[in-house]
């Protein structure tokens, strides 16, 4: 029988190069630890939000300042933001200043008052000091005769605000999506970038995507009426927000569904509905509303527009997990009503968009989703709602969309938006 071996312990002798290697490794680890400690003590920055109120004696309050898309309001907001940008970008806080945004105008006995939200990135240990610096910088610069802004003495100057509430306010303006993006597609296409289309939502039954929709207020969506042909009970529906279906930013239950009174499932007219969420969403960079155009808003044939959704990538094709986008063109109703296209089926409440050559188009599952256009300020407006078509990307069969301007008064009557 074999006997087990005898364990003999030997004294380990470290070679010089091994000792040197271990020493270097320990010194490197110590250096990294010290570096991290210094970073978190000195450079670790936190976002801080401050609300400031200003008095503008040179401007009289007008009702246009309460109208979201009025030129007077948008122009004055931009002028104020530009002045605050210049003040901080030319100051000792230029590396900490992020942005400012006017959130409200108020009437005053002798002018206008403006509430502004200002965003900074500040090292944690210096927050109090830099807040005082910001206060002093504003006071000094606003004393200049060149400034249209004066301090509103009736309120504390810089009031700190909760981050979530501040982001909600900063993103409360409608239609701020990405910069005009490059060509992409739904059919045959490319996924949309994160935060490209923050108003896009998914209408789902039992967790399955059925239709798209557009966020037009913190508690309201607009979509196609035909999405509810088979499932009319609001309790069956949930709404998902975010670029991917599998990992949404947030979800909401549906409180109510209002379908246009004249809609009938056997025809395409009046294919519009609004959906009220069970509770409001909190706006953020990745989740906020699209602008609704005035009823008089005009768009010309050949104008570039975008349609987005989680519909099929091609006729009878697979459905994506990530939001898709496609750039197409407006086609006049006269062209779309030609015999070889839709032969007179396009009414004044519809928009025709795509290409007569086919290929680029919305598809099954995109119903209810947005057709949007950008203005020269990079504000995105909801022109249409994916409604119907023949196949996907078929020659002489572009997509047909519910014309939002035609139903603008109806939307307002149901949502007060």
UniProtKB/Swiss-Prot annotation:
The active site is at residues 226, 271, 367. Pfam families: SEA, Trypsin. SMART domains: Tryp_SPc (SM00020). The keyword Calcium does not apply. Residues 43-417 are extracellular. This is Transmembrane protease serine 11G. The chain crosses the membrane at residues 22-42. One of its GO terms (biological process) is proteolysis.
